[in-house]
Design a protein with these regions (language model features):
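Bacterial N-terminal signal peptides
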Residues: 16-28
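OB-fold and OB-like single-stranded nucleic-acid-recognition modules
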Residues: 31-134
């Protein structure tokens, strides 16, 4: 094997080893870039992102047909800039979310949609919610 072939082989081997590390680093950077404030959520409608803020108000509509649980962030309803909504059919996975998450700093991941001109994420799995500081 001549020197040029050896250098070429070493270059290819190094690139193969480096590629997974570069891809992992890029994925971490993109994940961090998707973390947004509750006030910025309105600018990311129809996008999947992680929205972070403090739950200052909650409401469980146990008498309604859909039995929604609402987690209102940063300001009490109706002034909350962002809401996480847990549908009734998923509620059992969360225990009592209106008590568990009240006054907690959370990050919620999912597709941001608009309802009544306000951004929200429909939360169907506990893995979509992370308590900050844990």
């Amino acid at each position: 094997m001549d020197i040029e072939s050896t250098i070429g082989w070493i270059t290819i081997a190094a690139m193969r080893l480096a590629f997974p590390l570069i891809a992992l680093s890029l994925a971490c950077l993109l994940a961090a870039a998707d973390k947004i404030s509750t006030s910025a959520a309105k600018d990311h409608l129809e996008q999947t992102a992680t929205v972070c803020g403090k739950v200052v108000g909650t409401r469980y509509l146990d008498q309604s047909a859909n039995k929604f649980t609402f987690l209102n962030f940063d300001k009490p309803y109706p002034d909350s800039p962002f809401t996480a909504v847990i549908p009734g059919e998923n509620r059992a996975k969360f225990g009592e979310p209106e008590k568990t998450y009240l006054e907690k700093n959370l990050c919620v991941t999912g597709k941001i949609v608009e309802y009544n001109k306000k951004p929200e994420i429909i939360v169907t799995e506990p893995s979509q919610i992370k308590v900050e500081g844990k």
